[in-house]
Amino acid sequence: MSYPKRWRERERGREREREGEMDGGIEHRFVEVNGIRMHVAEKGQGPAVLFIHGFPELWYSWRHQIVSLAARGYRAVAPDLRGFGDTDAPPDVAAYSIFDIVGDLVALIESLGEDKVFVVGHNWGATVAWNLCVFRPDKVKALVNMSVAFSPRNPVRRPVDSLRAIYGDDLYICRFQEPGEAEADFARLDTAFLIKKFLTYREPAPLLFQKGKVFGGSSNEKIILPSWLTEDDINYFASKFENTGFTGGFNYYRNLNRNWELSAPWTGVQVKVPVKFMVGDLDQSYHFPRTKDYVHKGGFKRDVPFLQDLVVMEGVGHFINQERPNEVSDHIYEFINRFS
């Protein structure tokens, strides 16, 4: 059935009103950037803080930090990255290279009327933020990154090849490589169940998926949500991924080896902006081989010479910004306030 344009616009307006009610009066708009239409959530006036989400997430992952930073005199800006939520999702896998994604954010920064912004990243958003700082440090005042430490380019081995050699084909990153396979596995499960399983995963062990058996291959398991996560939160994430599917997010992983090839000219480049890094001690990313030694024994500081603060939160999993929202907001504010 085709509905009149005026009806569709009215319904979109009502949806935005409902989103505003559930997320603390955050405003929503669309921006044309780098050839795509990007959805942006924002709140507040003052120096701009760009929040970059990960997988399987949305701008909504930063809902607490947006409200907190806006109340403290900052303009909090959180887009849905390309392929996620209400932002366009180009069909071509090649449209999700790190250069495309960083290009989107450079255009977004310029659309804000800012020469430089503070940047906060988590998960894939952290990877994007590291690369933004490598490619365009002139756009970043300071960076707060979470969960995923900087990964200097290995000049001799592609990243997916390295991970497959350690973990085999069942590591989630390896399992996501073949177009269509992960989509078929995810389609067998309820979307809300998938979101719950990802957000509540707190094992320091790597996330492994047997072929055809993502999270055991069944949605029958009853999951009790932690205090920091509500059914409304799950439903918001699930409603968006039910509309878009997960292909956009998978395509980030499918470009890992291609990003390695394209970024050869930046081999050995340091991250030269002020940095604070935060991670939970139960975060699987923190327990990847050699990561702890890299973070704590000089390698991280060598590659990120302006690393100022390193915070390891005890008893905290991967989704640190949602699990400890107030503490994380305080850490962000304290750090960026030094440079405001």
Task: Mark where each language-model region is.
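Flexible "cap/lid" subdomain of the alpha/beta-hydrolase fold that forms the substrate-access gate
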Residues: D23-E27, R37-M38, P47-A48, R72, ...
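Signature tryptophan residues that serve as conserved aromatic anchors
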Residues: F55, W59-W62, W124, W130, ...
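Conserved HGGG/HGGXW glycine-rich cap/lid loop of the alpha/beta-hydrolase fold
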Residues: I36-D88
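Catalytic histidine-centered segment of alpha/beta-hydrolase-like enzymes
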Residues: V316-R324, S329
